[in-house]
């Protein structure tokens, strides 16, 4: 199977949750876990990785929490995948030519290289502000209705903007 790890999927949900909130809003990991249906056991490790990648900022102590380190419009899906997976490649030969002695002359390797570049380009072009704006008012999954104040800036069911004045 070609895919991403569960940790990467969970990281996407964390960044999406924060992207749907007004800029600089700080929330707890427990709130995100509850609202995005994430197992709390994985949260700390994922948050640390995202903070190391300068995607999230953490505040310790009483009143602490997490927030985006920069605007959602400056964070791409590619960055989150790299933070969690360390590299985005579909075949080890693409990024590590010494892995296979045939990689230099292999047409399959060149095909994988092209597909990998397309994937990286596509993921780099998807920003979290775009994803946050695409959140439906109600998710079909488990009655999720979005984070508090998530309606700010999103379209209402009647098609107009709601929240920000």
Question: How does the language model describe each region?
Answer:
Residues 1-15:
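Short alpha-helical segments that sit at the start of domains
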Residues 13-21, 83:
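Short amphipathic alpha-helical elements of helix-turn-helix/winged-helix folds
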Residues 27-37:
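A short alpha-helical element within helix-turn-helix/winged-helix DNA-binding domains
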Residues 34, 51-52:
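Alpha-helical residues within the helix-turn-helix
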Residues 55-69:
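Beta-hairpin "wing" of winged helix-turn-helix
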Residues 72-99, 108-118:
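Conserved segment of winged-helix/HTH DNA-binding domains
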Residues 96-165:
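C-terminal regulatory/oligomerization modules of transcriptional regulators
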């Amino acid at each position: 199977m070609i895919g991403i790890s569960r940790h990467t999927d969970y990281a996407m949900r964390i960044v999406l949750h924060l992207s749907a909130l007004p800029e600089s809003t700080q929330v707890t990991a427990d709130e995100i876990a509850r609202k995005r249906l994430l197992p709390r056991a994985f949260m700390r490790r994922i948050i640390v990785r995202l903070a190391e990648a300068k995607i999230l900022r953490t505040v310790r102590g009483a009143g602490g929490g997490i927030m985006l380190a920069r605007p959602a419009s400056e964070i791409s899906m590619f960055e989150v995948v790299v933070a969690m997976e360390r590299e985005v490649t579909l075949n080890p030969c693409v990024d590590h030519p010494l892995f296979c002695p045939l990689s230099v002359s292999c047409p399959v390797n060149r095909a994988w290289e092209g597909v990998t570049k397309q994937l990286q380009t596509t993921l780099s072009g998807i920003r979290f502000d775009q994803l946050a704006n695409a959140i439906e008012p109600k998710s079909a999954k488990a009655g999720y209705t979005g984070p508090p104040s998530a309606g700010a800036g999103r379209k209402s069911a009647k098609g107009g903007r709601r929240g920000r004045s």
